[in-house]
Amino acid sequence: MIRKTLGKLYVQVLIGVAAGIVQGVAAPNLGSDLKPLGDVFIKLIKMVFAPIIFATVTLGIARMENMKELGRVGVRALVYFEVLSTFALALGLIVVNLVQPGQGMNVDAAHLDTKAIASYTHAAARPQTFVDFLLSLVPSSIIDALARNDILQILVFATLFGIALSRMGTRARPVVDFLDVFTQGVFSIVGMIMRLAPIAAFGAMAFTVGKYGLGSIAALGKLMATMYLTCVLFVAIVLGGVARLAGFSLWKFLRYIRDEIFTVLGTSSSESVVPQLMRKLESAGVSKPVVGLVVPSGLTFNPDGQCIYYTMAAIFVAQATNTPLTLTDQLVVLGVLLLTSKGSAGVTGSGFITLAATLASLGKIPVAGMVLLLGIDRFMSEARAITNTIGNAVGTLAIARWVGAVDRERLQAALDGVPEAAQTPPQAVHVHAPVAHVEAAHPPLAH
């Protein structure tokens, strides 16, 4: 029994997290030197990140029977992302005003040392326009996009390539078959990499506690507690509501992806589980085209945890520096963040750059106040990353349910904990089929 429990990945990751905390407290200098353990794991995941997105998206689109549905899935996904991002920003705004974690700190922004955030404010001084964003979607070279792991550029090329293969018909069969085998091989590599997750969690947590210390948590514990509380509320209320509307149990789904959740807890990176999450969703009966389109784009357009953090951090700085903000001012903050929060996920330091750009554009909240966040930002990254991951997974499944791209029997079996080997063979779920038809007829799943 004990051996079986210890053999589960999420248990091993939890042990790694606990051991990392103990290491960071007992020997902080050694703990802060263990960062490479987590970095290597993240780099290994990023190594297969671009190939998986390219192959999965291309393969999924190439096998779609109705190209019109590709646009329908994309439009629904973008609308969903915008609505959920707004909910996340609004919830962060409401909770930070109710709890007021920065009230009473009475910080004079003029006396803060801003050297530590100079690189972020310098980057924020060159804001990206909407035209710049559109231009950045088109890769000058697909090799360059793959080398830089540029998610959006890879998605654009893979979508076009998939459409081209679909239009070629049987002539594209050799390429499609190759991509199928290639995808299976890369996912096999992912399985090997995931065995290192407990070691990565140990190193990442030992570094965090060893470098920043538990004292930084105590100093700004109210803000941290508020952040974690808000993320829990968002998952339980907002994502719970989405799951109910889509017709599946949120709690069963969270249990189904628990390995990925605990891996994110240890590594503080939502990117670290994207390949495994895509495989899990496909195993649960979600069609490959929907998984390939929604999961990668959700990283950029649907960072729910990041959105909660943005409004919370902005208002916290205002409270701590005694900067008065009217309701209109706060709604302006929300509106600006609704635009600036897009396209920043997955880039190191992007959260601080986005926040700095937002505060600078508003002109009311002192950018120097961001110094207050440096000490605990790393401790809040777990909450952001976990919420991002859960939000992306729930969103993908919900969108798939709404466009009729889920094999209901396989989904129910997965949520009930039936081993994949014991399930019935995959069946073809056509994206264009209405949900009622899929549930009633269960047409065969395209491979």
Curated annotation (Swiss-Prot):
Source species, domain of life: Bacteria
Keywords, in A-Z order: Cell inner membrane, Cell membrane, Membrane, Plasmid, Symport, Transmembrane, Transmembrane helix, Transport
Example of a GO cellular component annotation carried by this entry: plasma membrane
The keyword Transmembrane belongs to this UniProt entry's keyword annotation: yes
Location(s), subcellular: Cell inner membrane
TM region(s), chain numbering: 5-27, 42-64, 77-99, 146-165, 186-208, 223-245, 315-337, 352-374
One GO biological process term: L-aspartate transmembrane transport
Keyword Transcription: no
Similarity comment: Belongs to the dicarboxylate/amino acid:cation symporter (DAACS) (TC 2.A.23) family.
Role, per record: Responsible for the transport of dicarboxylates such as succinate, fumarate, and malate from the periplasm across the membrane.
Name of the protein in question: C4-dicarboxylate transport protein 3
Species of origin: Ralstonia nicotianae (strain ATCC BAA-1114 / GMI1000) (Ralstonia solanacearum)
